[in-house]
Amino acid sequence: MNDRQAALDQALKQIEKQFGKGSIMKLGEHSDQNISTISSGSLALDIALGVGGYPRGRIIEVYGPESSGKTTVALHAIAEVQAQGGTAAFIDAEHALDPAYAKNLGVNIDELLLSQPDTGEQALEIAEALVRSGAVDMLVIDSVAALVPRAEIEGEMGDAHVGLQARLMSQALRKLSGAINKSKTIAIFINQIREKVGVMFGNPEITPGGRALKFYSTVRLEVRRAEQLKQGTDVMGNKTKIKVVKNKVAPPFRIAEVDIMYGEGISREGELVDMAAEVDVINKSGSWYSYKEERIGQGRENAKQYLKEHTDIRDEISKRVREEYEIDGASKEPLEETEETLSLLDDE
């Protein structure tokens, strides 16, 4: 047994000498076993994710039908990162980002890094450079479907380019995944959906870009509109369901229900009223909502308005709800400039 241990120790020393300290270790010796997270900007989604937000150093895929709220979900996460003093980048392959809407959601557009690349290769090379800098806390690519390979752009309409985009994504993710983990960057890939032709049974919906992103993603979120939110005859927004389809850091298949209001994004007050009522932090009797024996509104909309006007009570309720769900809040520390992250570019 001693000979085996001595041989193992010798092998470990050789590996560390060749590849550097920390290249191999026992899992229990790892200094950071707890998953570091950044809040998604939505209390309901933080709870559904199970760890209080998006895990750092991981790949997240957000997909769904058109106008379901995918970009809104990503912009809320960017606003949260910036509020904690972090740096965020947005690669707008669709060339459709609305700065005014982003500002309404709390994004500091003066500090947001924005790129509108011409080709898929250019977009992913920019993404790699940003990740390897070790100085970007969150990177959003909108969207995978719009990452058009250079050969397709330079070709003519009607030319067949079978599997080009899938190969591009597969190669890019092979290069990016290690750097994303080392730099602790959260990489959010927004994706669209397509339908397979001739599927008789089962779900015909697929996401573009091949299978690679499905495998590399730690979390996959499916965003879908459930119903319209109306005030009288006017449509004010949509009730949206965000389903955690895949989760490597907590149990999957949880669903977050949020109100996405036009021009405002996710209604924090709406989800707070629902989540607080679920765990009896807010009491619901008939149509009345009350907190600590004090009525805060008749009907959900009035309760939402009360919390919007009384931010101190809103924050107090939010804290209690997080405690009830054992979500202690995401990490408040921005990415530190460690020797490891700053030397990422030199590792190639």
Curated annotation (Swiss-Prot):
Subcellular location: Cytoplasm
One GO CC term, this protein: cytosol
Entries under PROSITE patterns matching the protein: RECA_1 (PS00321), RECA_2 (PS50162), RECA_3 (PS50163)
Key words of the record: ATP-binding, Cytoplasm, DNA damage, DNA recombination, DNA repair, DNA-binding, Nucleotide-binding, SOS response
SMART domains: AAA
Binding site for ATP: G64, P65, E66, S67, S68, G69, K70, T71
InterPro entries named in the record: AAA+_ATPase, DNA_recomb/repair_RecA, DNA_recomb/repair_RecA_CS, P-loop_NTPase, RecA-like_C, RecA-like_N, RecA_ATP-bd, RecA_C_sf
GO terms of biological process kind: DNA recombination; DNA repair; SOS response
Compositionally biased residues, Acidic residues: 336-348
Main location class: cytoplasm
UniProt KW Phosphoprotein keyword: no
Basic and acidic residues bias locations: 325-335
Annotated region (Disordered), positions in chain: 325-348
GO function term, MF aspect, one: ATP-dependent DNA damage sensor activity
Family: Belongs to the RecA family.
Role this protein plays: Can catalyze the hydrolysis of ATP in the presence of single-stranded DNA, the ATP-dependent uptake of single-stranded DNA by duplex DNA, and the ATP-dependent hybridization of homologous single-stranded DNAs. It interacts with LexA causing its activation and leading to its autocatalytic cleavage.
Name of the protein: Protein RecA
Species assigned in the record: Listeria seeligeri
